[in-house]
Amino acid sequence: MTKYALVGDVGGTNARLALCDIASGEISQAKTYSGLDYPSLEAVVRVYLDEHSVSVEDGCIAIACPITGDWVAMTNHTWAFSIAEMKKNLGFSHLEIINDFTAVSMAIPMLKKEHLIQFGGGEPVDGKPIAVYGAGTGLGVAHLVHVDKRWISLPGEGGHVDFAPNSEEEAMILEILRAEIGHVSAERVLSGPGLVNLYRAIVKSDNRLPENLRPKDITARALADSCIDCRRALSLFCVIMGRFGGDLALTLGTFGGVYIAGGIVPRFLEFFKASGFRGGFEDKGRFKDYVHSIPVYLIVHDNPGLLGSGAHLRQTLGHIL
């Protein structure tokens, strides 16, 4: 008889829940709920389990916020809860609450070739560290290492490191944004809001007033080639994505590969392929040759957060991935 666990991927707007076959890791019965419609995450879980008439003992839910202890308070939502109390209330034997990029990193060993698009570099080296990052509402970062037959995710808040310009244009962007907001982190330029910041800074650098555009407006105009400022912003976004990925590669020697997740890049995939991304990735001066062979992959799996939550839980329960 198949034994299932509950897995989830929760952001600021939606909660996506599914079942994971504990033996195989296969994800099924995925359903998305609006977080605005429920008073708590526990309430959403109860509705899901009732709707699917399934009894589970174990669960793992990825959430887009730092997980530093038993108390979880979501960054972009009013939900807050005790992991221990929620586990008790649901009658679970195991309940793991992990960072969303911990989940994405744990999905990597489960991905197949059709779930990836490669951008340069050679073949990944088995057993070497892996980096994963992705731009969406914010900039998520994690690393993954393989130790004693176990995958260990190294989560953190790497998206909030300093933005490090490496050209006159990027230095100009930093100067303008720093005058507006003070500290300029990588996330301030590598995210949906970050794309808007790039556009605004480009326009302001020419002593003009920027329009009130949303990220999707900038992307659409750039792809239609109807706005030179938008096209410059998107081009610069791609280059800085490359620089940041190269920084991650240098930091931990990620010869196992660098992986890009998140919802932004797939929206302009062909533009990204032709951009200066890989050039930015390898623009490391004396260490250009060091990163030259490191492959970069774009994850195109529909639900890496659910897949990784399942992988994390299965490993916790003693399965070898």
UniProtKB/Swiss-Prot annotation:
Subcellular location(s) per record: Cytoplasm
A GO biological-process term: glycolytic process
Tell me its EC number(s), please.
2.7.1.2
Q: Spell out the reaction equation it catalyses.
A: D-glucose + ATP = D-glucose 6-phosphate + ADP + H(+)
Q: Which residues bind ATP per the record?
A: G8, D9, V10, G11, G12, T13
Q: Which CDD domains match?
A: ASKHA_NBD_GLK
What cellular component terms from Gene Ontology apply here?
Answer: cytosol
Q: One MF term in GO for this entry?
A: D-glucose binding
The alphabetical list of record keywords is:
ATP-binding, Cytoplasm, Glycolysis, Kinase, Nucleotide-binding, Transferase
- What EC class is this? transferase
Lineage, top-rank taxon, reads Bacteria
InterPro entries the record matches = ATPase_NBD (IPR043129), Bacterial_glucokinase (IPR050201), Glucokinase (IPR003836)
Q: Which NCBIfam families match?
A: glk (TIGR00749), PRK00292.1-1 (NF001414), PRK00292.1-3 (NF001416), PRK12408.1 (NF009073)
- What does the similarity note say? Belongs to the bacterial glucokinase family.
Against HAMAP family, the record matches this protein to:
Glucokinase
Q: What is this protein called?
A: Glucokinase
Q: Which gene encodes it?
A: glk
